[in-house]
Amino acid sequence: LGVFAYLLSKRKGKDEIVEQRLRQNTLKIADEIVSKSGKDLYRRPFERYYWGCNGTLARLTVNLFVADKLNPDKKYKNTAYDTVAHIFGRNYYNRSFVTGLGLNPPMNPHDRRSGADNIIDPWPGYLVGGGHSAIDWIDEEGSYSHNEVAINWQAPLVFALAWLLN
């Protein structure tokens, strides 16, 4: 985030060489995200699955946002849309990874507030971590490695949604 703040800052006196390198690297990474998305059946911008990978997907949209600010190109926003679509149900499981939203959302996040309130539906709006492989996700409260919720995953998802709605 510090790199992005530096790049988007209007502050005078920034080091031009540092700014140029950061700009080039940011655009290169964003272009790699776009390329990887184009190679995936579900337009998911990376191949690996691991604990919290949905949070990584959400964070990639921040990279795409900054790239779009530096070098406006619809490919960045389109890839962000595809990434969010994956999170909300355009995926192998044909279901959303956000409680209360999207297609067939998770019902059993690893979250004490949702699990202990004696209400069937979980608190809405939580992004859960996701599977460890394309076909390995289970909707069980006790499965923290699949269904954990974390603030550092929620924040970039909210950011992505705000950008895409703007």
Spell out what each predicted region is:
Residues L1-K39, E47-N166:
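Aromatic (Trp/Tyr) and acidic
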